[in-house]
């Protein structure tokens, strides 16, 4: 088999509709757009969300909530991700970025308790869940809030 002998799978290449090319084609004259009206015109049609003048859904529903501009966003990491470090390592947010465990530190790192930790580590982070603290200390490690 050579490159010029390759054929696309049956039905993979579909010919585009050629509209406005005579009545015999079935898509002549009005080109599948029906008779007159807004939708038959070039650039015709209504914007997304327009309901024909009826009060649209996005305006019938009440506004809710707000975005707290002072909210802190933490990079969350589960315990099982910390098993990549050697015993006795001091795990800091900078080290986590360096080892590509986390992409960005944001407002700090929060350690969550999903999974198990087999290594004895000293973990420094902004926040810890209760289960994460228990598991780190049970493995013989230390927890430091920074």
Curated annotation (Swiss-Prot):
What is an example of a Pfam family matching this protein? Answer: Ribosomal_L27A
Return one Gene Ontology term, BP aspect.
translation
Query: Could you tell me the superkingdom of the organism this chain comes from?
Result: Bacteria
Q: Which gene specifies this protein's sequence? A: rplO
**Keyword Ribonucleoprotein attached:** yes
Q: GO: which molecular function terms?
A: rRNA binding; structural constituent of ribosome
Residue ranges of the region described as Disordered: 1-56
Q: What is its quaternary makeup?
A: Part of the 50S ribosomal subunit.
What is the similarity comment for this entry? Answer: Belongs to the universal ribosomal protein uL15 family.
Q: Which UniProt keywords apply?
A: Ribonucleoprotein, Ribosomal protein, RNA-binding, rRNA-binding
The record's function comment reads: Binds to the 23S rRNA.
Q: Where is the composition biased (Gly residues)?
A: 21-35, 42-52
One GO CC annotation, please? Answer: cytosolic large ribosomal subunit
Keyword tRNA-binding present in the record's keywords: the answer is: no
Protein's name according to its UniProt entry: Large ribosomal subunit protein uL15
Taxonomy, top ranks, is: Bacteria, Bacillati, Bacillota, Clostridia, Eubacteriales
